[in-house]
Amino acid sequence: SKITDILAKLGKVLAHV
């Protein structure tokens, strides 16, 4: 789902910070 993709992207970005 798009939501899962978005959450995964956000999680990756947050984890990168």
Swiss-Prot record:
Listed Pfam families: Bombolitin
One GO CC term, this protein: extracellular region
PTM-bearing positions, type Valine amide: V17
Tissue: Expressed by the venom gland.
Segments forming a coiled coil: none
Assigned keywords, A-Z: Amidation, G-protein coupled receptor impairing toxin, Mast cell degranulation, Secreted, Toxin
Cysteines joined through disulfide linkages: none
Molecular function GO terms recorded: toxin activity
Subcellular location: Secreted
Superkingdom to which the source organism belongs: Eukaryota
Primary localization class, coarse: secreted
Biological role: Mast cell degranulating peptide. Its mast cell degranulation activity may be related to the activation of G-protein coupled receptors in mast cells as well as interaction with other proteins located in cell endosomal membranes in the mast cells.
Membership in a protein family: Belongs to the MCD family. Bombolitin subfamily.
The protein, known as: Bombolitin-2
Organism: Bombus pensylvanicus (American bumblebee)
